[in-house]
Structure formats: structure tokens, C-alpha cells
Amino acid sequence: MSDTPRGRTADYTILTTGYTTSTGPGVAATVSYVTDGDLHIVIDPGMVASRDRILGPLAARGVGADDVTDVVLSHHHPDNTINAGLFGRARMHDHKAVYQADQWTDRDAEGHELTPSVRLIRTPGHSAQDVTVLVGTPDAVVAFVGDLWWRPDGPVEDPVAPDLARLRASRERVLAVADVIVPGHGPAFAADEAVPL
């Protein structure tokens, strides 16, 4: 089965562009918003200077916290998840389940579709539980990769990755399908031959 989303009807925006220069002490997550049909999806609502960096851009689009239907967590590091509680009514998705209120449903993220245009795939490497969100828009396939890449320049060798070979294999898998990559802590960039592996 191809990783490419079957649909091309979704739209996305980056709510706030994160940063990192090393392994600390400062870091901010790149937080993104995807919409497709009735779904309003926030990806990696992590560390930011203020919650307004997430809620403000949503409000500018007419979307309140309670309107968000789904949150996808690329992995369970606090810098990518710390503001998930802003969206208490949403379904939370990770590598192994969907959570809502006080219930969860086990399911593997691999190939799970939120819609035909929004697909999850497992991409371990930065952590053993990494998930990438592949989004089919009318113009491109956009990959929200969490920390497979922290920013456009890598880092090539992730200093916290438990398995660099798996990281590289997951990066290659994403590059085989994506036109645009949204990293965990920086601006979006083209998925081309300049991307560090």
C-alpha cells in the first residue's frame, strides 16, 4: 500500500513556528492546524512562549479550542505535547490509540486515516513511538514529521535519537511521498535533494 493520502481535499496552516538551537534550554514547538471537511486537527501543541501563540491564530480563523475535533501527537516528548490539554474535547491520537475523555480505543497508527486526505504512518527514529501525519492538499502532500527533522537543517545526527538507522529509514520513507515537510521546531521546507538525511 502506498503512503500517499488517497484524497487531496485538506488544507493546512502553521499556527506558530518553533525554534531550537541545541538540546536546550530554550525550545518552542511548531504547532500546525489541518482542516478537512468537518475535522479541525491540531498537530503537536507543544511548548510555546504563550498559549496565545496557538489559540490566537486559531481564533483568527474562527476556530475555538472546543471546535478542535482531533489532536495528533507525533511523539510523547513534553516539548511537543505540553499544551494538548487546551483541547479537552478533542480526540487525541498517538502511535497506538485514540483517546477521548476517559476512554481510549487501541489501534496502530500505521495507515490510520482520519479522512482520505489525512493519514498517519509510523516513523520511528527520534523516539520509538514517532508518527508522521501525511496530508493531501490540492497542491502538495505535506508531512508533519514531529522531530524526525527538528528544523530544515536537521540536525543530521539527532543527539537524542535512540536509533539513527531507524531515523534515516523513516526520513527516507517520508521523502518518498512528501512535497513539503513541517518539522517539529522550525519552518516548513521543500522535500527535495537538499534535505539532510
Regions found by a protein language model. Give the residues of each.
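Short, acidic/polar N-cap/turn motifs at the starts of alpha helices
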Residues: A29-V31, A109-E110, D130-T132, R171
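Conserved beta-strand hairpin/beta-sheet module of binuclear metal-dependent hydrolase folds
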Residues: D3-A60, T132-W150
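Short Gly/Pro-enriched turn/cap motifs at secondary-structure boundaries
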Residues: S22-G24, I121-H126
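Short, hydrophobic/aromatic-rich segments at coil-to-beta transitions
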Residues: T9-I14, T115-I121
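Active-site neighborhood of phospho(di)ester-bond hydrolases with catalytic His/Asp-centered motifs
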Residues: I43-P45, D67-H77, H93-H95, R122-G125, ...
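Metallo-beta-lactamase
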Residues: A49, A128-L197
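Active-site HxH/HxHxD metal-binding segment of metal-dependent hydrolases
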Residues: S22-V27, P45-P116
